[in-house]
Structure formats: C-alpha cells, structure tokens
Amino acid sequence: MKLLSVAAVALLAAQAAGASIKHRLNGFTILEHPDPAKRDLLQDIVTWDDKSLFINGERIMLFSGEVHPFRLPVPSLWLDIFHKIRALGFNCVSFYIDWALLEGKPGDYRAEGIFALEPFFDAAKEAGIYLIARPGSYINAEVSGGGFPGWLQRVNGTLRSSDEPFLKATDNYIANAAAAVAKAQITNGGPVILYQPENEYSGGCCGVKYPDADYMQYVMDQARKADIVVPFISNDASPSGHNAPGSGTGAVDIYGHDSYPLGFDCANPSVWPEGKLPDNFRTLHLEQSPSTPYSLLEFQAGAFDPWGGPGFEKCYALVNHEFSRVFYRNDLSFGVSTFNLYMTFGGTNWGNLGHPGGYTSYDYGSPITETRNVTREKYSDIKLLANFVKASPSYLTATPRNLTTGVYTDTSDLAVTPLIGDSPGSFFVVRHTDYSSQESTSYKLKLPTSAGNLTIPQLEGTLSLNGRDSKIHVVDYNVSGTNIIYSTAEVFTWKKFDGNKVLVLYGGPKEHHELAIASKSNVTIIEGSDSGIVSTRKGSSVIIGWDVSSTRRIVQVGDLRVFLLDRNSAYNYWVPELPTEGTSPGFSTSKTTASSIIVKAGYLLRGAHLDGADLHLTADFNATTPIEVIGAPTGAKNLFVNGEKASHTVDKNGIWSSEVKYAAPEIKLPGLKDLDWKYLDTLPEIKSSYDDSAWVSADLPKTKNTHRPLDTPTSLYSSDYGFHTGYLIYRGHFVANGKESEFFIRTQGGSAFGSSVWLNETYLGSWTGADYAMDGNSTYKLSQLESGKNYVITVVIDNLGLDENWTVGEETMKNPRGILSYKLSGQDASAITWKLTGNLGGEDYQDKVRGPLNEGGLYAERQGFHQPQPPSESWESGSPLEGLSKPGIGFYTAQFDLDLPKGWDVPLYFNFGNNTQAARAQLYVNGYQYGKFTGNVGPQTSFPVPEGILNYRGTNYVALSLWALESDGAKLGSFELSYTTPVLTGYGNVESPEQPKYEQRKGAY
C-alpha cells in the first residue's frame, strides 16, 4: 500500500480532529476520538485485527527485543546490536528515550551527538528492524528518576497527573522527542510502527486521582500534536485492562501489558516458585481487549540486580535458556503476536544515568551480554523459537484453546495448550503440569490430525519431556504444499529452494521423535547413519521415528529433505534473508522470508547477499568454524566470507561446505599499575585556606519540593539548587561558643550511598553505606571547640541517582538528595550557614557532549580534569594502588596507548579486584564516567568499556577518583585491564563519539 503524502496525512488528521470530542483540562484542550475508526484516518499502513498487526496489508508477527540506545553511547555500535537481533529472527526493537539526558535544564532540549535519535533510526532501517517508540515522559527503566530530570523535584504538582505545572513541564520534551520520532515513522519511510504513550501507568495511591483518563488523553494528544500518526500501544504493568480500547477517554489503540513472572531473586537462580507461570493471560485478554492483537510489551528476558546483589551472571542463571523454553512457549500458547523481550541487550549505566536500585552494569542477564557477546545459550534458544514463528504464518490465525491435562497426552504430569487452526495447521504446546519440575517425563501424544485421531508415537519408542523444558508439536503443518501431519520434534525453519524443500527439525538430548508426512514417496537417508531411524508407510503417509543424535541425518521424502538435528547443533544454524538488491535485507515480509537461505556458521551470521555469481556472507567467529550453505541460489558460483573469497565444495545434496580458520591475535594490553600516574587531592574543601565564595548559598527558607517538608532552617535539598547528579559537597560555616560536643547529621543519597564529614581538617567519620539504606543517621563526637572561632563542617555525599516514580501519588522521584537534618549540640541549627556544590553549573552543565549527568561535584570533576589531556604535568606522582593513608578523596590520571588488530571485536574490562574495604571509586575513560566501584557493598568489580569509548588504536586517558571513608585510608587492591575471547568480525569499523579534551573552564572553582 502506498505511503500517504504529507498533505494527505495533514488533511486526514484535521478530519479526525474535527470529528473529535473536545473538553478542557487545566487550560489545555483534550481531544478524544469517540470512534476508534477515526484514528484509522491518520494512516493506513499499520493496521490490526484481533489476531495480529498488518503492515502494508500483510499480517505480521512482531518478535521484538528491548534496547536502550542511551545505554551504549557509541552510535556506530547500534547497528551491531540490530544485526544480532535480526539474526535471532526478530523483526522489531522497542526503545525508551530518557528525558533526563535530553533536557537537563528546563526548556533546553538537546538531542545531539550520542543523544541524537536519528542515527538509531537509520541503523534500525538499515538492519530492517521495526521500532516501537517509548519516550515516556515517564519510563521507569531503572534510570535516575525513572527518566524524569531532577528539576522536576521543584515542580509544584503531582508527577504523572493532570496537575498543570507537571503537564507544562513535559510539553517541551514531548514536543521535541515525539517530533523526532514522527519523522521516523513508517509513513515517512522510517522504521517506527508503534508509539507508546506513558509507561506502566498502572498504580496509584495517596488520594491522587488514579487512573486519570484525562491525564492519559493529554499525553496522547501531546504526541498527536507532534505529528505522531502510528497506533498507540500501552504497556500496563500487569494484565489489568487500564486504558484499553473502548474504555473511553484516554484509551489507546492497542492494549498491551508487561510480565516478569519469575521476579528478580537472582540470589536463588534455581528456584522457580509455585504458581509463577501465567495460565490466564488468554482469558484476561478476551475480557479486556478482545478486538486487538494480544500484545506483551515487556516480557521478562533477564532481571535487574541491586547494590550488594549476587551479580548478573546469577541473574542470567535465573532467567536462562530453560526459562526461555518454558515461559516463551507458554506465551505463544496465548496467541501473543506482539512480543517484546525486556531486555534483549541491557548495556551500561554509564555517567550516573542509573537509579539507586542498580549499579553501573545493566547487563540484565540478557540474551546479548553487556559486551555485545552472543555466547549465552539463551540467545541461541530464542533464535530457534523466533525462526520457527517466522516460518509459521498459520500460527497467527490459530485460535488458542484452554490449558488441558490428560486430554492430549496419556499422563497428568504434562499440560497441553492447543492452538487450533481455522485452516489446516495447529500447534500443541506441551509442558510439565508442575512447570518447575526437573524430572524427565515419558508420554504419548493423542492428537487430532487430517489423518484422524492418532496416538503418537505410532512406531516404536516413547516421547519424553526433560525437566524445565517445553515443546511445540505441529499438526498439519504446511511446508510449501507438503503436509506435515505431525512432528514431535520441534521445527526450526523450512524453505523451498529450486527443485526441493528443506525442513529443519531438532530435539533435546536422549529424546525420541516421530514425524508423519502426507506423501506416497519412500524414505531415503541421504546423509548420515540409519542407526536409530525407523520408517514405515501407513495409508497415504510415511512415518519416520528416530533417536536424537549429535550427528546430523538428512532424510528425503519426495522433494522434501528433512534435517534431523540435536538442539545444540541447531544453535549453529542461521536463516538470513537475501536482499532483492544491495546488501541490506530491508524489513521482513513473506517475500523476503521466502528468499532466505539456511547457513551453518557457528557464532554469528550477520547477513548474506548475492552479487552476480558471488554469494557473500557477513559473519563473526570465535573459533575455527565449518560453514555450510543450504539452498545456495541458482547462479551462485563463488563464496565470499567477510569480503574474502573462500574455497568451497559442493556435496551430492547441493550443500556448500567451507571453513573459516580462527587464530586468536596477540592482544597486548598495558599494565595499569605500571602507568605514569599523577595524583591530585580532589577534596581541597577541607583545607582552612579554601575559598567557597563562588559556591551556591543554600539559603532558601522554603523548599520547592512538595514531597518532603524541611527539617532544617533552610533547604539543603540539592535539587532545589540545580544539582541532580553525582557527588555533592556541602560546607557549613558557624562560630563556636565552646558548648558544642557532638554533631548529628542525616544524609540521603539513595540505596548504597555513602557520606563523610570533616570539621575543618579533622575527620569526624563516615556513613560507609549499605545496600538497603537510602539514608543514614550519624552522630560524631567533637573535641572542645574554641569559643568565637570560625569553623567549617564539610560533608561529602554520594548521590547514586534519583528514585523512580512508579506509583502515581507516592512522589518517590521527589525523595531529596543531600542533608535532611542536622543538629550541632550547644547551638541552634540556624547558627550554621551552608553552601553547596555539585557538578559545575548544575543545570547549566559544562559538557554538552557527554550530557547533564556524567559529572559530579568533586573538585577534579568541576575543573574538567577527568577529560583527556588534563594539565597534570605539575601534579605529584601517585598511584591508586598506593592510595590514601587517611580519609579523603584522591584523583588519579594516566594515559596509555592501545594497538588492537583491526577486524576483531575484543571485549575489554577494567578490573578492580575483590577489595571489600569502605572505599568508593569512579572510573573515567576518555572523559566518560564508566564505573562506580563500592568495595564494601559490591557486587561489581569488573567494568567493561566498549570500543569507541576506548580508542582501540590510539591514545586513551583514564582517571579515577578514590574516596577513603575510613580512618586508615584506602587503596585499590588491584587495577587491571583485561580482555576475553577476541571475535573475528565482519562488522566493520567502529567510530568513536566525540571525546572533548580538557579546556580551562570559565568560573570553575
């Protein structure tokens, strides 16, 4: 279907608006469409019925992965992620936009460089990946403030409500962000097909109006005013029906919800609690939104991990390949057709962008690791499932039925959900009745087929389901005109090539399977041993039974070749689409899917294309890898791998075979301990000579924070003064009267924060932090103070990000950072006058390239010494491995060169060692803050930094702040640069984002 012209879209939008109901909300006009059909007038490219979306009139399954571009600040690597997601068999990515990174100052929207959205859109289009845009304004996402910029703490209104001050505060951001998204809509030739207004608008409390339909409508109208014309889709936090179509004002076009059924108990990864596998999603969908396709906008693909947690490898163990097998097939049993996995690639909470409930890594235990690696078994297992769905269009029109036990199998230990096709083609999802069972269960299937009701296996042997496993058995499955009456082995994919068809089946270890094909032809084994294979004719069908083997067998029945694989072997197979022209595949359609070939290629196959007689494969390798091409196009004569011609042979079955040799290159990394380290005391504020006259006076008698009243004479909430990120430093001046004996202070910086206090140059003590503690009370004994003498209390606080705001009305995002209360014995609280600082300039932040959150308030940060080429020549020598002999904060900087080989993707890590002392460190790499280490809290000790932030062939600048919170000081036990397996890659060059070097900052103090 043709794209609508800009004029046509404008005209139809005007018609739709003219037919709408208008009413007023706090001075703003709300547009409510009384008839959902009116929304269709905005565009006719993305449509839907009760079963699925249609794009350009073709029914489509959206298999999607969540990716946040802001968690990988190297735009030239975004295409790498899209390649790896497309290789899974996915066709879509969902993404958040983080408001806090784009409007650090009210009214000053900046989306440039690493924050620009257009390169993300361009990369998606090049990879042939559709996009679901989720700009918020609230996103949650385990980011600081849930995506709300810190200055919203000063808004005199309830967040995520119809309060006018809040709505006005969002207008500029949404107008700009949504406009950028609008330009990338499919109606403009871009990849964006759906738009999600708000995010998990699913809970309220505390007397605030919730749900507020007018608020939701306002959010949608903001997007429409910015020229968003694609359908609105929601992500209710649970299947509760909020804002579902037909619910009136604030209703979205398509209802969707989230689900994290296994939770986040990464400390106990083998525990699958009773009752956590959903079994009622289909029923709820029919109750809540029966006219729209069943949509899971966020389904668990990993888990977050808090400070002090067990680490993300444990989170992967919790949500691993067994989870994906059981839970994702269960989701398919409900007929899901928009299916987004959160997260598919997690990334990194660099530059203070995370919330206090998490640390620097946002690996999430995702299918793709933080280092963009695809070696996790979950990645491969999901690839098998996604390619099956892609090859099975009849899934989208099959009708899910009720969960059963004892109906389709001969045992009550198994449960089966059928999806019955209106035309031939049904699917039977089998799992353990006790979904967490780790037992292997033998069974026979009882299936209705076109050949009658059958008990399977019909030949010898029994079927088995291993523990924590699930299968989809197909019945009357169409392989280009050949009817697969049933298969107990799972389908990976099928293709029709010139002269024959190929069906790829796989099974688990020690399993027996059976396949029936409607055919009058005989069974011929054309590759592999016939050991363990039996076959017979029965009526107009042939039946084949076999034991799963790690050795491939190929059987031929007529023009159908059936590849019999074990699951681990199937992991090495890929199904790239061949572009009709050029080298990019374009968006998937039934036509492009039919053009696919099947390739066995090991670690990663990014894509394939045909150039005359040359078949080109673009792939990555982490070992010497045999390559096979199944279904090479007619006319293809030569094989090229990553641009290099590769010799190949062709066997009797037409399969091309070649091999890529892998020889790991020599990787030479500098010893960080041997660098020429320079040291600077970055806490000069405790010295008697320090001048804080340029600092902000904390003299507001009232806070603008409506959430928490003051317990101090003037506000000491950092956001009242424009400081929202990183370290905070306070200096309190008073004149002693000689009666002071102790000082009490309550500080707040979010979970796992720390604080330290000095009186003049005398260290009083620290709150060293705990994973559970968002704030801390400390009382410090004072020596006799001299009456009439001026004293200064210096307080350093680690702000680990602002809280999220999930529940409307709780206003948790407004939980302040800084000093909540204090008491100096013998003095009135007003006797102390305070000054404070955070990042230089606060909301007028200095580094526009790295954004508003990257820097905190340390002296070295305010000066910009964490950037490349600091003026360190005159600094004294000193290493973080020598550290500090007393409490304080040191700053260390050094440089080193890298010369890593081109054509290799080499994951690099900065490792701090397992040091449990009360010390905190910040890691800066070429000016980007890429790690916050907290020894006594943990768990993260290893910090991956991607190419682009690190210059793999050039000079790099590394800086560390080291904060000793105990009286005996602190040092790093170790500090090393390491790597893991180099990957020979066909990706191409990685371009570094801007890395502004040090320049003297005007007004720096």
Curated annotation (Swiss-Prot):
One of its GO terms (molecular function) is beta-galactosidase activity. Keywords: Carbohydrate metabolism, Disulfide bond, Glycoprotein, Glycosidase, Hydrolase, Polysaccharide degradation, Secreted, Signal. Its main location: secreted. It catalyses: Hydrolysis of terminal non-reducing beta-D-galactose residues in beta-D-galactosides. One of its GO terms (biological process) is polysaccharide catabolic process. It holds the Pfam family BetaGal_dom2. Glycans are attached at N156, N373, N402, N453, N478, N522, N622, N760, N777, N805, N914. The keyword Secreted applies. It is an enzyme of class 3 (hydrolase). Residues 1-18 form the signal peptide. The keyword Glycoprotein applies. GO terms for cellular component: extracellular space. The active site is at E200 (proton donor), E298 (nucleophile). Its EC number is 3.2.1.23. PROSITE patterns: GLYCOSYL_HYDROL_F35 (PS01182). Optimum pH is 4.5. Disulfide bonds join C205-C206, C266-C315. It is found in: Secreted. InterPro entries: Betagal_dom2 (IPR018954), Betagal_dom2_sf (IPR037110), BetaGal_dom3 (IPR025972), BetaGal_dom3_sf (IPR036833), BetaGal_jelly_roll_dom (IPR025300), Galactose-bd-like_sf (IPR008979), Gly_Hdrlase_35_cat (IPR031330), Glyco_hydro_35_CS (IPR019801). Belongs to the glycosyl hydrolase 35 family. Cleaves beta-linked terminal galactosyl residues from gangliosides, glycoproteins, and glycosaminoglycans. PANTHER family: BETA-GALACTOSIDASE RELATED (PTHR23421). This is Beta-galactosidase A.
